[in-house]
Regions:
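Metal-dependent amide/peptide-bond hydrolase catalytic core
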Residues: 251-431
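Divalent metal-coordination and catalytic microenvironments
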Residues: 62, 102, 115, 144, ...
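Acidic/His- and Gly-rich active-site-bordering loop/insert found
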Residues: 38-140, 145, 149-165
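Histidine/acidic-residue-rich, glycine-tolerant segments that coordinate divalent metal ions
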Residues: 100-101, 122-124, 128-139, 146, ...
Length: 431
């Protein structure tokens, strides 16, 4: 049989059997699958609009009741109630953290796609002036309240069309993203077991509503943390020759480390090396016995070359001054990279199918990080950004700001795109 161009009709005998040509091959998905697939796209958009008030209400509830990383007990309890209220009862609460998963089983056998939302808040005192602002000293300043609401909205949509799904949808509600620990906790309790693909979305304060960015390639950088301890020998400030000044050594190391960025790194590969904390001594006229620096490395490189470069500079610089220094280097999260061609196509196609080409945003790669990438080490994944900024409404503050908020009109769109991605992935990979 000669190859059939994408989008063309299958031969008559295959068409009668319910075959569709998708992703370069014929898929049998049952009688009238093509018509049913088209109807599902319309249903998802319409259902999202129907549930818009629900999604906004849930966002406001979780915004008003934030909980810090590792303390999300009440948040999890309420999410469970919300899921059970829509008829989703196959729920697993993790034992060693406040994470939770729920399974939505489709009407036909197939693969399992996971949709993920993070649920923790930040230790920020809110100054948004919203009538539903938090009052407990912490705040959903990174948009996790919106993520919960969008995933609950997607769950409600998919629950309504579950009979048409060729596979299952696993809902992942992850704690402790803000401290880059929750994804690892969930992996240790096998939250990704049985999952074939993963999708996540982040509401973003520098992307205009109602755009949705599903760009391929680099999306968010890794997060590495380092500590440098420089040994010294204490002496009076009037007699530095009798001691060994670790602050001077630390300053030299700090300056030299920028060679990793400007002289050892391909300039086409983004790299940030920031020393954000330096401490040494407690008295204005006494040379201390130690200096300590802490900082972060952000890059899209997956290897350990930056650590090795830093270690060589730290060690050799200290030796040049006749002392020693130690580098402690922690790999907290890998980069978020949309590198699976199939998932990239499905993710973009979901936005276009629902809202047209004009709805596709373009956000450049970000040097901030997301521990979604830890879950993404297990299976192919795709990560999207939902625009939350609306200058006309005065919604202009970025994520982490004490006055941060989002254009709530975009939340139902975020829910629809998540649901559409899940439905399309399951349709394309149907058994």
């Amino acid at each position: 049989m000669r190859p059939t161009p994408e989008g063309s009709s299958p031969p008559a005998f295959l068409k009668r059997c319910g075959a569709v040509f998708y992703g370069g091959r014929f898929l049998y998905t049952g009688k009238n699958a093509a018509e049913r697939k088209g109807a599902a796209a319309v249903d998802i958009k319409a259902l999202a609009q129907t549930y818009e008030a629900y999604i906004v209400d849930r966002r406001r509830y979780y915004h008003a009741n934030p909980e810090l990383s590792g303390q999300e007990e009440q948040t999890r309890r309420q999410i469970r109630k919300d899921l059970e209220a829509m008829g989703i009862t196959e729920i697993t609460e993790l034992r060693d953290c406040f994470g939770m998963t729920a399974m939505l089983r489709g009407g036909r056998p197939g693969r399992t796609v996971a949709l993920r939302a993070d649920i923790d808040a930040l230790p920020v005192r809110e100054a948004s002036g919203l009538p539903f602002a938090s009052t407990n000293g912490c705040m959903h300043a990174y948009g996790h309240d919106s993520h919960i609401a969008m995933l609950l909205g997607a769950a409600r949509i998919l629950q309504d069309v579950r009979a048409e799904l060729a596979g299952n949808v696993k809902l992942i509600f992850q704690p402790a993203e803000e401290i880059a620990a929750g994804a690892g906790w969930m992996l240790r309790e096998h939250a990704m077991k049985g999952v074939d693909a993963l999708y996540g979305a982040h509401i973003w304060g520098t992307l205009d509503a109602p755009l949705v960015d599903v760009s391929p390639g680099n999306r968010m950088a890794c997060s590495h943390r380092f500590t440098i301890r420089v040994e010294g020998r204490s002496a009076h400030g009037s007699a530095p020759h009798l001691g060994l000044d670790p602050i001077m050594v630390a300053c030299t190391i700090a300056t030299s480390l920028q060679q990793c960025v400007s002289r050892m790194n391909d300039p086409l590969n983004p790299l940030v090396l920031t020393i954000a904390s330096i401490h040494g001594g407690s008295c204005w006229n006494v040379i201390p016995g130690e200096a300590v620096m802490e900082g972060t490395v952000r890059t899209f490189l997956k290897g350990d070359q930056v650590e090795h470069q830093m270690r060589r500079i730290v060690t050799s610089t200290a030796e040049a001054f006749g002392t020693a220094a130690q580098l402690e280097y922690e790999y907290k999260t890998p980069p978020v990279i949309n590198e699976d061609p199939q998932l990239n196509r499905i993710a973009r196609g979901a936005v276009v199918k629902l809202y047209g080409e004009e709805a596709v945003g373009c956000l450049p790669p970000l040097m901030s990080s997301e521990d979604f990438s830890i879950l993404g080490t297990q299976v192919p994944s795709a990560f999207a950004f939902v625009g939350g900024r609306n200058r006309e409404k005065g919604i202009v503050y970025t994520n982490h700001h004490e006055a941060y908020t989002v254009d709530e009109d975009v939340l139902q769109r975020g829910a629809a795109v998540m649901a559409q991605f899940a439905a399309d992935y399951l349709a394309e990979t149907a058994l």
